[in-house]
């Protein structure tokens, strides 16, 4: 087997951009940003848009997206004459 062909796994903190929740896990991602985690150690920080702490499927809080205006516009445009 060849050595040094696989990416290196490091401990990385993923931070939810919408609510600030943080997760410490192993990842091959790296970042120049660092953050001091709960355990007092400093880790690379990767900010993500959405995680299980903010996604409606996992939180149980469904958000209604108002698509009525777009549907009406579509029906008006393609209405049979």
From Swiss-Prot:
InterPro entries linked to this entry: Ribosomal_bL28/bL31-like_sf (IPR034704), Ribosomal_bL31 (IPR002150), Ribosomal_bL31_B (IPR027493), Ribosomal_bL31_sf (IPR042105)
Entry keyword Ribosomal protein: yes
Protein name, as recorded: Large ribosomal subunit protein bL31B
A Pfam family: Ribosomal_L31
Highest taxon in the source lineage: Bacteria
Family listed: Belongs to the bacterial ribosomal protein bL31 family. Type B subfamily.
Keyword list, A-Z: Ribonucleoprotein, Ribosomal protein
Source species: Borreliella burgdorferi (strain ATCC 35210 / DSM 4680 / CIP 102532 / B31)
Subunit (UniProt): Part of the 50S ribosomal subunit.
Alphabetical list of NCBIfam families matching this protein: L31, PRK01678.1
A single Gene Ontology CC term: ribosome
Gene3D superfamilies in alphabetical order: Ribosomal protein L31
Lineage: Bacteria, Pseudomonadati, Spirochaetota, Spirochaetia, Spirochaetales
GO biological process: translation
Single GO term (MF): structural constituent of ribosome
Sequence intervals crossing the membrane: none
Name of the encoding gene: rpmE2
